[in-house]
């Protein structure tokens, strides 16, 4: 089952979320917005099972990555934009 995965610009490019994902949903891509010069990307959300291991692994105070499940998708993502 596919879930919406949102990467926020608070990402510090640490790769913790990418390494935590058991299904390789995430990857790092070049980005000039942080010192690491990279940001997480979610090109394979169709493989996301919603385990939220990426969220748990994120070391930022404000979770830089969020997985939205079912009704949570439209409700929460609507607030983010």
Swiss-Prot record:
Protein origin, superkingdom: Bacteria
Regions annotated as coiled coil: none
Membrane found in the keyword field: yes
Residues annotated as domain 4Fe-4S ferredoxin-type: 2-31, 37-68
Pfam families: Fer4_7
InterPro entries in the cross-refs: 4Fe4S_Fe-S-bd (IPR017896), 4Fe4S_Fe_S_CS (IPR017900), PSI_iron-sulfur_center (IPR050157), PSI_PsaC (IPR017491)
Binding of [4Fe-4S] cluster 2, residues: 21, 48, 51, 54
Enzyme Commission number: 1.97.1.12
Catalytic activity of the protein: reduced [plastocyanin] + hnu + oxidized [2Fe-2S]-[ferredoxin] = oxidized [plastocyanin] + reduced [2Fe-2S]-[ferredoxin]
GO cellular component, one term: plasma membrane-derived thylakoid membrane
Topology class, membrane: Peripheral membrane protein
Cofactors required: [4Fe-4S] cluster
Keywords: 4Fe-4S, Electron transport, Iron, Iron-sulfur, Membrane, Metal-binding, Oxidoreductase, Photosynthesis, Photosystem I, Repeat, Thylakoid, Transport
GO biological process: photosynthetic electron transport in photosystem I
Co-factor note (free text): Binds 2 [4Fe-4S] clusters. Cluster 2 is most probably the spectroscopically characterized electron acceptor FA and cluster 1 is most probably FB.
Residue sites binding [4Fe-4S] cluster 1 per the record: 11, 14, 17, 58
HAMAP family: PSI_PsaC
Quaternary structure and interacting proteins, as annotated: The cyanobacterial PSI reaction center is composed of one copy each of PsaA,B,C,D,E,F,I,J,K,L,M and X, and forms trimeric complexes.
UniProt cross-references to NCBIfam families, sorted A to Z: PS_I_psaC
Protein name: Photosystem I iron-sulfur center
Source organism of the structure: Synechococcus sp. (strain CC9902)
